[in-house]
């Protein structure tokens, strides 16, 4: 993405955002309040809107970096492995809080029910943004989403805009 407008930057895209381990149960139908259902299948996947954005950007050929917060736990190790395997520069911060999780039930009609446990994602504060100012200033685009604190998104975008980077926020 080297162009006169963006000059020579280290990254095409920096994503600041969430990373979760998705725990997915396949069920015949979604549970009603108070009902217990038996799953016919189970899988774990890397997830979180931020991590998903970073993977998509990297797979599209962009030089991609990820800034987020992970726990010092097995889920954090799995997600760091995904970042490495996908060729994404990992600037994730370790926390003493468990890595975020999403508990997902998917029924036979592909309808789902999701409970998100933010965990470490909610510890992505202004301090993390400040610690990564040089990364946020050395990219053409900064992507974010609202699975991390809003004040951190605003601070990251302020840094990026000073460096004349494009900013984009996925609100849903």
Predicted features along the sequence, with ranges:
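Glycine-rich phosphate/adenosyl-contacting loop at the front of the ribokinase-like
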Residues: 1-69, 76-81
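Ribokinase/PfkB-type carbohydrate-kinase core domain
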Residues: 2-19, 77-94, 104-172
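Beta-strand->loop->alpha-helix junctions that form or flank phosphate-binding loops
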Residues: 16, 40-44, 67-72, 87-100, ...
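Short active-site-adjacent helix-start/loop capping segments
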Residues: 23-25, 74-77, 99-101, 113
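Glycine-centered flexibility motif
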Residues: 34, 50, 71, 100, ...
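Short glycine/serine/threonine-rich phosphate/pyrophosphate-binding segments
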Residues: 49-52, 75, 98-100, 151-153
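A broadly tuned preference for mixed-charge, low-complexity surface segments
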Residues: 63-72, 149, 153-157
